[in-house]
Every structure is written in C-alpha cells, then in structure tokens.
Amino acid sequence: MKVLVAGSTGALGVPLVRALAAGGHEVAGLTRNPANRARLRALGARPLVADVLDRPGLLRAVDGLTVDAVVHLATAFRDMPMRHHGMAATNELRTRGTANMLAAARAVGAGRFLAESMIFGYGYGDWGDRVLTEEDPPFGPPGRNAGLEAHVAAMRESTRRTLTAEGIAGISLRYGGFYGPGPASEAIVELLRRRRLPVLHGAGVISLVFIQDAVAATVAALERGRAGQAYNVVDDEPVAWRTFLRALAEAVGAPPPRELPAWLLRPANYAHAAFTTSMRVSNAKARRELGWAPSVPTWREGVPLIAAALRNAA
C-alpha cells in the first residue's frame, strides 16, 4: 500500500511511519519543517515539505504523487496544553487542515482517508460509570463552555468532513490519551519530575492507549476499517488520573505529585477540564471490526515499559 502521512514527525506519526515502512508499505511523510527531511528518510519515508494549512502549497507538494491512503495526524501539540488558547492551532488543523488534506487525498487518488480524533470528542465532563461506545452521540451538548466548545466543534467538523467525504472511504479514529516511551510521555514525565503536575482530589478518569497499540490500530484501520465509521482506540481498563500519575512518578523516580483541590487548577482552564473529565470508553468495536487488541492492556503493564525505556536511554 502507498500511504501519505500528515503529522509524520509527531508522537504518533514517527512510530506509524516506521511501522508502515517496516511492513513493506511505501510511505510519504508530510512535514512543515524542511529540517525533518533527513529524519523521515531514516524512518523509510519519502519526505514532502508543506504546511497543511496552506492548500496551494500542499497541492504543489503532492503534485505527481499517487497513493492508496492518506492518514491525517497533524496537530500542533509540543507540550501539554494548559489553557484553551494552547489548543487553537490544533483546532485549526482539525477544521481547515482536514478540508485541505481531503483535497490533497483526492488529488493523489487516495481511496481511503483516516483522520485523528480524540475520545474527548464525546464531551468534557463527568460521565460517571457509563461506558461510552461509538453508538453514543459524540461531541457533547454545544455551548456549555466557550473554550471547550471550540475544541469539540473542531473535532466535530473534522469527523463530519471525514465520514461524509464523497468518493473516498473516510474513517475517524478516536484515540485515548497517548502514553509510552518517547514523546508520548516526555512532557508528562518532565512535569512530574519538576513537581509541576499535581493530582487533583476526587477528579478524573481516563481511557489511555499505549503508543505502539495506537500505531497497530491505525494500521489495522488502514487495512480493514469500514468506510464512514469511527473507532475508539483505547486500552482495556480506564484509570483515575491520580492513580496513573502517582504510579508513573514512582516508576520514573520523580517525587510524589502534589495533591490539590481541583478548583485550584481552574486558571489552567484546559488542563482543568481534561483532568476533571471522567470518561470510560469501550474498544469493543475496534476489536471486532479491525481485529485489533491492545498488546499493553492496562497502565499496569505500560508504566514499567516507560520506566525501562528511560533507563535504557540514560
């Protein structure tokens, strides 16, 4: 299969490009930064330089290229966003960027288009013990909070464009929180080491996914995903943020996180929303239709792998 990957040097893009190339696929990696060319070649990809938000430049970059599938993973995450404005660039990549990538997909003759989304698209807040599936209405009730609505609206728009695209099999992947060796956990580990990431009293449950399992699910969706479908890509056991962060801090030798009442994090309004959301998400559809299952089923197996990778890199 010939695959074009946007966001090819990101936390998910790098291991995905590596896995696709190792699996015998021809990969073109889209990057905004010319300095990433050598890195993409080392991963086994043909580098293409363009800004996803610049449609004319993007179409020039892919001119003459022919692929079977396009994977749109482009985000603007560099560090963990703390305030709503830290999500603005990613929101634009999910709206205008998705529209531009669909135009590029048509230009290169792609038959499949996969777009990144997040389980937070179900809506920030406390879902209690309810287990969310793809049958649940995504994107929550609009208007509850202007900042949160901007993020949810961007995911809503990306998914709508992806799943209703004419002449192309569009698939939306709703990833859980990424963690694992390398960039997937570097920001959190650094914040824990500096005691800059507290645990909040009584707050927050999240469905995570180990980064290599996110890669495997993406490859499975490329090969077996159904057109017009969304898939939750999460592990088998939701975990309280406080439990996960304490375990990760201990495993990597960081000091125990400070404990704070949740209201003290409100000035960091995006982080407050993310860490106080309680969300349990099912991966049954991805298991059933993609033939995928997480190799790291829970955080209990995943946290030691992060610690081991850090020791090996030291």
Residue ranges of predicted features:
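Glycine/proline-rich active-site loop of Rossmann-fold NAD(P)-dependent oxidoreductases
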Residues: 126-127, 156, 165-168, 179-189, ...
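Amphipathic terminal alpha-helices
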Residues: 297-314
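Active-site Tyr-X1-5-Lys
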Residues: 140-170
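Conserved Rossmann-fold NAD(P)-dependent oxidoreductase catalytic core, especially the SDR/UDP-sugar
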Residues: 82-87, 91, 96-148
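N-terminal Rossmann NAD(P)H-binding glycine-rich loop of SDR-like oxidoreductase domains
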Residues: 3-25
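A conserved pocket-lining segment of Rossmann-fold NAD(P)-dependent short-chain dehydrogenase/reductase
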Residues: 139-147, 187-209, 213
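Mid/C-terminal beta-alpha module of Rossmann-like enzyme folds, strongest
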Residues: 18, 217-271, 311-314
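NAD(P)H-binding glycine-rich loop region in Rossmannoid oxidoreductase-like domains
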Residues: 32-41, 45-96, 100
